[in-house]
Amino acid sequence: MKSPVYGSVWIAVIWTCGLVCPSAAIEVQPAQTQVRLALDRGKEAAAHRQAPETLYARFGSDDDLHPGGFLVTKLAGLSVMATHMALRGLEPSAADIAQVTKAPTMLVSTVILGDNPSFAVNSYMVLDQGGRVVKPVTVRVDGQASRSQAWPESPKFRAKVVATFRYVDFDPNAPTTIIIFPATGGEVRFTLSFADIE
């Protein structure tokens, strides 16, 4: 694994315990039992007053001074939706569930850090799976970064770079490197094992 090149932009990917399971893999077509388990996981999280966003598959760091990110897979999306709804005393409808399970894309959200408020504009993200580059369907960035806790010291600003990737374009079981190309130059690589993520 290559060490990240930071320069004036620091990028990382966050990993937390959320939905990680040794026998899991990113499910492109979840079975009914997997859907039920994901919904139950969300209800249980709500019963324990756990924040819905803790159910995403995270990578990197999770504090304000270091960059990070998360994946929104179908099963994670179901758990998060069930948590949100259960916290309001509601149940997801069949249409709600179908909307998540039939989603054609997976979202990858990262936070990068830099030293000027527009440093993230025109940043880009790809997935590398053993030399095969997967391009995103969409990439969105914060046009105006927010101040980091380090302000006025470096890194002064935090901004999101969010991309969606079509499930049919990548291998949901492959070791994958998320590569972010900051607009200010350079590249940063973070390696994940999609086989370990639900």
Q: Whereabouts are the PLM-identified features?
A:
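Bacterial N-terminal signal peptides
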Residues: 8-19
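Conserved functional micro-motifs across diverse proteins
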Residues: 25-198
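N-terminal secretory signal peptides that target proteins for export/translocation
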Residues: 1-6
